[in-house]
Amino acid sequence: METKQFKAESKRLLDLMINSIYTHKEIFLRELISNSSDAIDKIYYKTLTDDSLKFERDDYYIRVVSDKENRILKIADTGIGMTKEELENNLGVIAKSGSLQFKKENEVKEGYDIIGQFGVGFYSAFLVSDDVTVISKAFGSNEAYKWNSKGAEGYTIEPCEKEAYGTEIILKIKDNTEEENYDEFLEEYTLKSIIKKYSDFIRYPIKMDLTKTKPKEDNKEEFEEYKEEETINSMVPIWRKNKNELKSEDYENFYAEKHYGFDKPIKYIHTSVDGVVSYNAILFIPETTPYDFYTKEYEKGLELYSSGVLIMNKCGDLLPDYFGFVKGIVDSEDLSLNISREILQHDRQLKLIAKNIKTKIKNELESLLKKERDKYEKFYESFGRQLKYGVYSDFGSNKDILQDLLMFYSSKEKKMVTLAEYVSRMPEDQKYIYYAVGESNERIEKLPQIEGVLDKGYEVLYFTDDIDEFAIKMLMNYKEKEFKSVSSGDLGIEGEEKENTSNSDDKENKELFESMKDILSGKVKDVRASKRLKNHPVCLANEGELSIEMEKVLNAMPNNQNIKADKVLEINMNHDVFKSLKEAYEGDKEKLKLYTDLLYNQALLIEGLAINDPVEFTNNICKIMK
């Protein structure tokens, strides 16, 4: 029996196949099953073009058999089989695809896409085997042939006996090494898991004889093992079924089967697109946040299938980061894959699918907000933070997509409201969208800075997430209305008369404020009369783009650079405390320093900032109480 050499620089190419193209050894089973599916597809195609042939679906299947004792794994199919010449051409020439040639020579009917295109999948068998045998009998032929290879040195082909047409691949599984455990590819559980993972939606049954137990007939307390044939794969994926025939329970069951979460999805999206690129997709918006969602360990992405075969567990390129919470699958026959089918080539089709999915998710969320407000608010409680990160990231380039999905607590409505709802209620004389920042709604309601805005009857949005103000800085405005913090220097609510009064107060008490500023040198940029305070004696305002709350967030980060906002100490001229300040300035400079330090530290505490010297602060309080 003559040993023939592989063509196409066999040794180097086969070594490349085994060591470089595939990153996961378990992929071999996916590739061999896909080849078997292609072989059955070819039989089906012949029945479409030859009226004398009938396609009885029950006659066509793929069988996987494990023989642990002899370290043999078999993958058999009832497909079209191969002649001697086809064995020579398809298996003797690495990177020649019989399926691709079949597709070129025949117009494959819609609904039956032949998977193979590179002619390399078969050689993934050498990832787990160093002795590969193929026994095949071509449809319509009386002759069968056996192809065998032990690696890059070559292969043999000889006649053999085989009753039915089809192909059987026999792998002699490698022995274990220190680095690799090959025994697992003989275990029923592992084989079943790999089939479910990669080939669950192959359209033909993938059968295995599984070991089970039952009570012995003569002794019910003892159990015996027996074999039972099972079809491992689901075959018809839910995304290819008619949406009108599916119920909510079907989607919820699929969500649970895929282990997307322990909750029920708050919304599912089933879409089928035909056009420049065709695909089916089922997307789920979870109800609750995964435990690791806001950690670097979380990996976004959708399951990606090509013609029902899993290509990627999580294709991150299909989802923008701000929609990274979405779970689901995409299946398309139009994708450009690399030679191993493990890595997707970044092409126009993928980008188009991703763009469509992004738009679909946005539209569904807007619909949920409009029609099922309670559900949306529950979703927003879990994932609103991610949407705000989306506005902040990439220098605000996504703000137009996300701004109408944002919600904040309202001082007026005492509930979450959208920016559109806020703007729709603004009085004609209101120039800005006002917001206040704090650790909680309760803390914000007690802020001195909020008094003046509420006194005007204006609505204030409460920002309690550390990302809120950063996101708004990127948003800048909404429907031509700028955002304004209640702690900012100029609130834009003072009338001309009040403005003049305030300026007059600053001039009249210029020397007092200068003295206080000197006492607080390096701590505040200025001391001035307040235009916003009603009942509180003092507060801190900020000048510039960096707010006091942003300072707190940035300085809480690792490797912070002790960033400081420009602070202004504002004094309520109508409060009794101011009278004490004036008296101290006129008669007791030491007492003025004491009062100034106390008021500054009081303002720091109101803002949730640490005071520099707590001991001195408490001693100063004691001095006043003497």
Swiss-Prot record:
Keywords per UniProt: ATP-binding, Chaperone, Cytoplasm, Nucleotide-binding, Stress response
Places the protein is found: Cytoplasm
Region (Disordered): 490-509
Regions of compositional bias (Basic and acidic residues) in chain numbering: 498-509
Alphabetical list of PROSITE patterns matching this protein: HSP90
Annotated spans, A: 1-341
Chief localisation class: cytoplasm
Superkingdom: Bacteria
Subunit structure: Homodimer.
UniProt-recorded name of the protein: Chaperone protein HtpG
UniProt source species: Clostridium botulinum (strain Kyoto / Type A2)
Upper taxonomic lineage: Bacteria, Bacillati, Bacillota, Clostridia, Eubacteriales
